[in-house]
Amino acid sequence: MKRIAVLTSGGDAPGMNAAIRAVVRKAISEGMEVYGINRGYAGMVDGDIFPLGSKEVGDKISRGGTFLYSARYPEFAQLEGQLAGIEQLKKHGIEGVVVIGGDGSYHGAMRLTEHGFPAVGIPGTIDNDIAGTDYTIGFDTAVNTAVEAIDKLRDTSSSHGRTFVVEVMGRNAGDIALWAGIASGADQIIVPEEEFDIHKVVSTIKDDFENRGKNHHIIVLAEGVMSGEAFAQQLKEAGDESDLRVTNLGHILRGGSPTARDRVIASWMGAHAVELLKEGKGGLAVGIRNEELVESPILGSAEDGALFSLTDEGNIVVNNPHKARLDYAALNRSLAQ
């Protein structure tokens, strides 16, 4: 394989630029040419394809976002869109594609492989909701951004004796809420993987203020459960009388310079994706398990579902067996600040 392309698709994630950089530099070191595709699959169909060299990726490792831009392009799910994209790849002499993104991006990569264009996926999403890898690119940065924000909210919460509901991204997976909540010492964490009793949530708030000597309360809520405003309304209807505020961290979690960890794993996975394409392998997704590079079928990585579930005792059972087990209940209550 002499010429490959790289694209980013779906929601952006800190560390995508580091992955692109690794793809380009590794490919060049292997004597391959690299082309960039702007705006994901939309750019592929439109022919927005151009050569990439070492100069184009210089100083990109520390930048957030993706300099190749990104877009959601549902039309690529249809055969017509796929064939139009493949026509452009052929026109530019491209023999393989590295796709950086989430589950929707992975489905597009699988379609390319089925049409004879080997594609390798790199998990790039802050939600950490791709199976086959312990961590996705951008997750660590998003968690650190969330923790920094929650720490600051705790300052104002304790100054005024308030309850804060902090909404974070996580449509189908509560990983950001879980990890950021634990790291910030949140009093309660509400995730899609666990059903909650609103009356117990209210009771816990009341217990903190009346019996535990606390003058503030922090609840971290994954957006996949419901919006922060809707959750706050349920709290009030269930009898919460605390001075309640809602903060939605929203898209701020996608921005910022990637952490060292995100830069490193993005570099590892980008280089490994090139190695797979050099061997003519497609339909695979690169991942990190136990700090080692692995690959798995790309479609399975996109469709394995939730990465963890919670037992009645509050224990986190990670569906990916290579992830650590954490005691949700113990960390939530005994270590809460």
Swiss-Prot record:
GO biological process: canonical glycolysis; fructose 1,6-bisphosphate metabolic process; fructose 6-phosphate metabolic process
Single GO MF annotation: fructose-6-phosphate binding
Alphabetical keyword list: Allosteric enzyme, ATP-binding, Cytoplasm, Glycolysis, Kinase, Magnesium, Metal-binding, Nucleotide-binding, Transferase
Keyword Zinc-finger: no
Catalytic residue positions: 127 (proton acceptor)
Annotated compartments: Cytoplasm
Sequence positions that bind ADP: 21-25, 154, 185-187, 212, 214-216
Enzyme class: transferase
Coiled-coil zones: none
GO cellular component assignments: 6-phosphofructokinase complex
Enzyme Commission number(s) of this protein: 2.7.1.11
Listed cofactors: Mg(2+)
A Pfam family it matches: PFK
Gene3D superfamilies (alphabetical): 3.40.50.450, Phosphofructokinase domain (3.40.50.460)
Pathway the protein acts in: Carbohydrate degradation; glycolysis; D-glyceraldehyde 3-phosphate and glycerone phosphate from D-glucose: step 3/4
Amino-acid positions noted as binding substrate in the UniProt annotation, renumbered to this chain: 125-127, 162, 169-171, 223, 245, 251-254
Positions bound to ATP: 11, 72-73, 102-105
PROSITE patterns the record matches: PHOSPHOFRUCTOKINASE
Residue positions binding Mg(2+): 103
InterPro entries tied to this protein: ATP_PFK, ATP_PFK_prok-type, PFKA_ATP_prok, Phosphofructokinase_CS, Phosphofructokinase_dom, PKF_sf
Subunit structure: Homotetramer.
Similarity comment text for this entry: Belongs to the phosphofructokinase type A (PFKA) family. ATP-dependent PFK group I subfamily. Prokaryotic clade 'B1' sub-subfamily.
Function as written in the Swiss-Prot or TrEMBL entry: Catalyzes the phosphorylation of D-fructose 6-phosphate to fructose 1,6-bisphosphate by ATP, the first committing step of glycolysis.
NCBIfam families: PFKA_ATP, PRK03202.1
Protein's name in the database: ATP-dependent 6-phosphofructokinase
Provenance organism: Streptococcus equi subsp. zooepidemicus (strain H70)
Gene name of the encoded protein: pfkA
